[in-house]
A protein has these predicted regions:
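N-terminal subdomain of lithium-sensitive/metallo-dependent phosphomonoesterases centered on the IMPase/IPPase/PAP
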Residues: 1-102, 188, 275, 288-296
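Residue-level signal for inorganic ion chemistry
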Residues: 22, 53, 64, 105, ...
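Short secondary-structure junctions
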Residues: 30-41, 149-150, 194-201
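Acidic active-site catalytic centers that drive phospho-/nucleotidyl reactions
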Residues: 53, 78, 100-103, 107, ...
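Conserved acidic residues
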Residues: 73, 94-96, 128, 173, ...
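DPxDG-like acidic metal-binding loop motif
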Residues: 87-155
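Short helix-loop capping/hinge motifs at secondary-structure junctions, enriched
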Residues: 149-152, 157-159, 274-280
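An extended, acidic
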Residues: 163-296
């Protein structure tokens, strides 16, 4: 197994190269490394997939395989999952990298700048290392779960630790939410939780980064017609846990990855950890009323 230091060194190079690719596409410039300049978009499937997604996907996969040809892990990416996965069957891998080359494709295409790249190393269904790159902020978050260490890093190597807020009272907690993906059930749940202010941000990684900076405190995902996938959640969860925060189902159960179903369905609550138990308890009670039988 490569050392943590060796892995981080490769990750630093790959994420900043990925940032250069994405920023070039976002500005209609020629991407580096010979990727096609046209930002073509496929609107089929469960969401738009752009040439930028595919370029970063290829860059990350090639980079991992080149740097670690004999590493004891498998690689799973959002863009290759359909080819790799068989319904109901996990990959035969004790160690697994789960990659999302572009989380927040709609925000990327709309030019909000609120998109991210996710990389997570999962061991026996639980994340142990996470990376969330925010290209337009020129920031990358790293999280080492076992070491309980999370930090933000810039291109020049400057680091600062995660700084979760100290807010505890529900009425003081700041919610970070999507501009989209909101339905009546979620609105009723949020009304019952009676949180404080709300901040709208694109990308799960971008949302969790606001918790890591202490700007917000709570993120809630409530599945409906669709659900987030392993690649949406694994890296943000890893960094938040490494920072001392909390990320779980509303019944307190942990999120599991590579378990044969890439959907992360249910009510998922991420927070600064200060009021996680209270939030989970209230969410369970509320959902039992507004959506009986819903598996949290």
């Amino acid at each position: 197994m490569p050392t943590t230091e060796a892995i981080l060194a490769v990750l630093r190079r790959l994420v900043w190269e990925s940032a250069d690719i994405l920023r070039a596409y976002a500005r209609s410039e020629q991407p580096p490394f010979g990727y096609p300049p046209a930002l073509s978009v496929d609107h089929g499937g469960e969401g738009p997939v752009s040439a930028a997604d595919l370029a970063v996907n290829q860059h990350l996969l090639d980079g991992f395989r080149s740097a670690f040809p004999d590493a004891p892990w498998a690689l799973l990416s959002e863009e290759t999952a359909a080819e790799q996965l068989t319904a109901g069957e996990p990959l035969d891998a004790e160690w697994l990298w789960i990659l999302d080359p572009l989380d927040g494709t709609k925000d990327f295409l709309q030019g909000t700048g609120e998109y991210a790249v996710h990389l997570a190393l999962v061991h026996n269904q639980r994340p142990v290392l996470g990376v969330v790159l925010q290209p337009e902020r020129e920031e990358v978050w790293f999280g080492l779960v076992d070491e309980q260490k999370a930090w933000c890093e810039t291109r020049d190597g400057t680091q600062r630790p995660a700084q979760l807020s100290s807010r505890v009272q529900r009425s003081d907690l700041v919610l970070v939410a999507s501009r989209n993906h909101r339905d009546e059930r979620l609105e009723r749940l949020l009304e019952a939780l009676a949180l404080g202010d709300t901040k709208a941000i694109g990308s799960v990684g971008g949302k969790v980064a606001t918790i890591l900076r202490g700007e917000t405190d709570v993120y809630i995902s409530l599945s409906g017609r669709s659900a987030p996938k392993d690649w949406d959640m694994a890296a943000p969860e890893a960094v938040l846990l490494a920072a001392g925060g909390a990320f779980s189902h509303a019944d307190g159960a942990p999120l599991l990855y590579n378990d044969g179903d890439v959907r992360q369905a249910g009510c998922l609550i991420a927070s600064n950890g200060k009021a996680q138990a209270e939030l989970c308890e209230l969410a369970r009670a509320c959902l039992a009323e507004i959506d009986p039988g819903f598996a949290v």
